Design a protein with these regions (language model features):
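Long, contiguous binding/interaction regions
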Residues: 1-48, 64-72, 76, 89-91, ...
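Short hydrophobic/aromatic beta-strand micro-patches
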Residues: 58-61
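Active-site phosphate-binding and catalytic loops of NTP-dependent enzymes
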Residues: 80-88
């Protein structure tokens, strides 16, 4: 291994702010969906199902505008909790918006797409979190 290469490698410092727990942030995202009239809101505890993420937040919006609002307001709430979105998919099409926060993934569906993919059935082994009680 070339030691010159090693000396040019830089490290990224951890953020100076403190993020709240993944469970708390997932519940905050669920509450934001509810506050913006999202329907059929679920928080799934994914820790026993996959090592990739801890929680899924799943909700349904009835229109493109509502789907965008839930996604945008969820992102603002996650930022307020000290989190940074790592990626987003599906915003333009507005059928299924996926926001990746590393340990929390927020899914906002239109009704037909949610019915087609049935994530809660696909991940039926994941325990459901009583997010309203947790908040």
């Amino acid at each position: 291994m070339n030691t010159a290469t090693l000396s040019t490698v830089s490290t990224v410092s951890a953020p100076s702010h403190t993020t709240s727990s993944a469970l708390h942030r997932a519940c905050v995202a669920a509450k934001v969906a509810a506050d913006n009239k999202g329907r059929d809101i679920l928080v799934l505890d994914m820790r026993s199902c996959t090592p990739l993420y801890d929680y899924f937040v799943i909700s349904t919006g009835s229109s493109r505008r509502q789907i965008h609002t839930v996604a945008e307001e969820s992102d603002a709430a996650m930022r307020a909790e000290g989190d940074t979105r790592m990626g987003i998919e599906g915003y333009e099409a507005s059928k299924w918006v996926v926001q990746d926060y590393g340990d929390v993934v927020v899914h906002v569906f239109d009704p037909d797409t949610r019915d087609y993919y049935k994530l809660e059935e696909l991940w039926s082994d994941a325990p459901r979190v009583d997010w309203e009680r947790e908040i």
